[in-house]
Amino acid sequence: MSNTEAITIEAILARDNMCRAFAAVKRNKGAPGVDAKTIEQTAEHLRRHWVTIRDELLAGRYQPGAVRAVEIPKPQGGTRRLGIPNVQDRLIQQAMNQVLTAALDSSMSEHSYGFRPNRSAHDAVEAARRYVKQGKKWVVDIDLKQFFDQVNHDRLMSMLSRKIADKRVLALIGRYLRAPMRQANGQQQKRRRGTPQGGPLSPLLANLYLDPLDRELARRGIAFVRYADDVALFTSSERAARRQLDSVKGWLREQLDLDTNDEKSGTGRCGESQLLGFCIHETGDVSIAGKALLRLKERVREFWDARQSLTTRQLQAQWQRFVGGWWNYFSHANLQKDLHTLSGWIRRHMRKCFWQRWHDRAGRYNALRRLGVKGRGLKVAGCRRGAWAMSTHVVVNQALKTATLNRFGLTLPWVLAGRM
């Protein structure tokens, strides 16, 4: 059986595939869609009505629900619009994604790293590092303007029709692409373009839409990496970089009906650009990009803002999740220069937060005593200096030293690195 023939509605609805899809949706959690049903409520609904839903899918009559529009802040500023499907539609999309990925992933470009099995952002950065080590030290950054909102439905469906023989699957994908977007004010917006982020099927459709770009760049012999809509080309000279930027921009407009963001697209030496939060230097060393460090500092300030309504225990749990995820991602960079200084800055914000949370002289006195401060050191509880200034006081510093913070579960990045 060919890969094209393997993609059928029966394969998508197979019991084992649906069970794996439900486990994935449950594991990913996520907010309810327009119908406001949770995963548990949807599971109960499916127990009662799955036979009818399955029959509609098999007959090609199933109609997806509207998607809920959600605006989230982008790290570099502005907002990104997500389209959150109902849990039931997330389940069906996930089942489709599993079958389509199994059949089509092997035919995709080796230069594509985003949202694919056994590939990661770290693999993309490592490939880019190899290009730089080979002497390709000029980078072409291509930023696709509102890519997920601008995918041309007709072109995408034409591409899919060459890969999927089952008309029911094609029709279902088309309905998901056209599912209306429900705004916060209740108005519904028809969709004629785009595959909004938020559903399990969107990343795969995005990769399929950009696969012709991968093939064109490979045909030209260009060194490049692509992670979803982040595209970076590597050349040996500034002249070649500028030529490729102009050429690829024109090709994208003509062949894929996509525009580039001129403010964010451009050329430069490798150390001047960033890729997926990392900066690759001419020596081949990898460091954290400046913007990524700024985002970390913003997040730290948010975490340790004393005005948060979270309890200390809740802060601890969230901090452990955050710093663990941050470290797992950025530990691949060379952090020796920044890590110790950065950790000291983080610890100062922690001390500031606790000083504010102790509220007044009595609260600070009792807290310092519990932390082992004795005698004259306890007089600091009555100090009238501001919290940021007090965060460097020798008594507060000793009371909330690294070992104490570790004991409270407030691990620092340099501790994770084994640099006690």
Feature annotation, model-predicted:
Residues 88, 92-95, 129, 157:
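Duplex nucleic acid-engaging cores and interfaces of nucleic-acid transaction enzymes
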Residues 349, 354, 358-420:
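Extended C-terminal regions of large enzymes
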Residues 49, 56-71, 75, 110-272:
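Conserved polymerase palm-domain catalytic core
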Residues 1-47:
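Non-catalytic, polymerase-adjacent accessory regions of viral genome-replication enzymes
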Residues 13, 64-70, 75, 177, ...:
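Core structural elements
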Residues 264-273, 319-322, 339-347, 362-371:
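A glycine-rich phosphate-binding loop feature that marks nucleotide/adenosyl-phosphate handling sites
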Residues 190-195, 285, 301-315, 325-338, ...:
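Short, solvent-exposed helix-loop connector elements
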Residues 178, 253-326:
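A conserved non-catalytic segment of reverse transcriptases
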